Structures are given as C-alpha cells and as structure tokens.
Regions:
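A conserved helix-loop-strand patch within extracytoplasmic ligand-binding domains
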Residues: 4, 21, 126-149
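Short amphipathic alpha-helical coupling segments at ligand-binding clamshell hinges
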Residues: 6-17, 148-149
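Periplasmic-binding protein-like
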Residues: 18-39
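Beta->alpha turn/N-cap motifs
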Residues: 1, 60-61, 87-89, 99-100, ...
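Immediate post-signal peptide segment of exported/extracytoplasmic ligand-binding proteins
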Residues: 40-55, 74-75, 143-149
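Short, well-ordered beta-strand elements
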Residues: 49-61, 79-85
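Ligand-binding "clamshell"
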Residues: 1, 114-126, 141
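Short helix-initiation/N-cap motifs at beta->coil->alpha
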Residues: 83-94
Length: 149
C-alpha cells in the first residue's frame, strides 16, 4: 500500500488475516511446497465498526487465490475485499501509487525496493504471508560464486 496507510484498521485487518494460522495452513495445504507459508504471526484484527471495502490488486495465482480464501474471514470483520487481477508487474504498483487500489499483493521486497527507486513511488510492505521457492539448475556455470548479489 502507499506509505502512510499502514495503520488504517482495514489494512491492519488484511495483514492480520493473511498472517493468521488459518490462512497459513491453507497455503501449506493447497500449494504442496510450490508456495511456502511464512508461518503464522498472531496479529490483532482491529474492531471495524462501519463496513469498508478494500480494493487489492494481485496476480492470479497464487496471490488472488489466497485473497479469495481470506475474503470471507475479512467479511466477518466488516471488510469487503475487492480483488483486481493483473497479469503484469507494473500496473498494480502504479495503481496503488495513484490511489485506484488500496493495496497490492504480488511482489517480493527486492522488486518493491527497485520499483520505488526507479519510479519514485511510495509503496510499502506490511507483511510477507508466503514465499515462492526458486530452484537453481545446472547449466553453463560450474561455480555459483561467479554470481554477484
């Protein structure tokens, strides 16, 4: 989400639900190691008296699927989740920056840091619900030390 919105109750509710044991267990059960949960972190879901809608951009899989699972849980706390799927990695960030999305869910921290630096945007991460493992496969390089950070 855009910097400065981290403490909004609906954003905190979204973060808490994504990090809940329920969602973390669902990730583990549904992605068979292709997507790995980060581990439950019991964040408090704030009281939200008036219904609110959060518009969140996400890649179709696994991010939008995880949000679809989280949506009914959020609804129990007066938060309606509107999920907007994107098939590129630029529009979700520009939409958060211009305010047409409240948040997005699709990227890792190094990508976000580079995007902010290159585009002059002000997007921050609140939680990391999962990671997607990557493999290194043999090819022409015999020693991994040739790769820099």
């Amino acid at each position: 989400m855009k910097e400065g919105r981290e403490t909004e109750p609906a954003i905190q509710a979204l973060a808490a639900v994504l990090m809940s044991q329920d969602v973390q267990d669902w990730i583990a059960a549904n992605y068979n190691g292709v997507v790995m949960p980060m581990g439950a972190e019991e964040l408090t879901i704030p009281e939200i008296a008036e219904p609110v809608t959060l518009k969140v951009g996400a890649s179709p899989s696994p991010h939008a699927e995880i949000l679809e699972y989280a949506a009914p849980i959020l609804a129990e706390h007066n938060v309606t989740l509107e999920i907007v799927e994107f098939d590129d990695y630029v529009m979700p960030n520009t939409a958060v920056e211009d305010g047409s999305l409240d948040a997005n869910y699709f990227q890792h921290q190094p990508y976000l840091d580079d995007f902010n630096a290159e585009q002059g945007t002000h997007i921050v991460s609140v939680v990391t619900p999962h990671y997607e493992p990557m493999g290194i496969y043999p090819g022409k390089t015999a020693d991994l030390s040739v790769f820099s950070k």
